[in-house]
Amino acid sequence: VIRRTSSLRARLVRFAGAAAALAAFAGAFAPAAHAQQTAICYNCPPEWADWASELKAIQDKTGIHVPSDNKNSGQAIAQLIAEQKSPVADVVYLGVSSAFQAKDKGVIQPYKPAHWDDIPAGLKDPQGYWFAIHSGTLGFFVNKDALEGKPVPRSWADLLKPEYKGMVGYLDPSSAFVGYAGAVAVNQALGGSFDNFKPALDWFAKLKANQPIVPKQTAYARVLSGEIPILLDYDFDAYRAKYKDHANVEFVIPAEGTISVPYVMSLVKGAPHEANGKKVLDFVLSDEGQKIWANAYLRPVRANAMTKEAAAKFLPASDYARAKPVDFAKMADKQQAFGEQYLKVMH
């Protein structure tokens, strides 16, 4: 009996010791797990608009880790719709017309972040479903070294010249917002409207003969490598290439005109890390968050974040006068129909 009792006691002591060790082991890992706060963003590509610096600053200042994500606006919305019953993302970054679609599809929810009142009325949804964080002007991002001695194109008409065969790229306008923005820009510049996309469709049909390159996602690196010598893209990508990557590039605002468009963010409906998502949205509108956009050559929605040093690197105001505003609600309304028409013309 005594032996059995002492044996039982020994087993209990060993069990207690193991339990204590297990608790200590778990305890050692608990702070690390707790410290690793996360928020999931759809369409936050590190190569686009210097999201790499913004995501790093978010982690440094808030402790929230936001993984980068290479979806475009259309792909992000498709994923949000597919995951509607069990959302994965917390926040989403979209071209403005895509934000109208996201609201219509019920995949985003209202949130009015810090500095809400600093955002101009036309650059936010009145209920808070989306709000602009910065804007860009569409034009030609040109790698001059890849032009093989040809002149830098200055107009939409120039891009149709046979000498630029195989040199012109644009993102797919049936999927990527920047692609659709390019289509709207050429359409408006050539006399079209949201009720008449014939000028743009005719232009794309003519461009087809020049064998354009049509990626679905951000193509910054492909311009720098010379694979795509001329890309329909925003000013901020060209300025980044010129001033940060020291590439021999030029940004051109076409002679016939172009458009400037905002990019926006939203809180995802049913966000699994909603509190963290809100902190991310607060940060991108903070003084520091907005300054990162300005230093990446975007126009921050809070204009006072634009430094004199950054502003001096933009083309003159006389060039930007050719960039016209458009009705973003109409732009959103016509996006799907244009995408379908475009696919018919190009395939």
Predicted regions and their residues:
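Periplasmic-binding protein-like
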Residues: 50, 118-121, 136, 166-175, 201-206, 212-213, 283-307, ...
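C-terminal capping/gating helix-and-loop segments adjacent to ligand/active sites or protein-protein/ligand interfaces
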Residues: 290-347
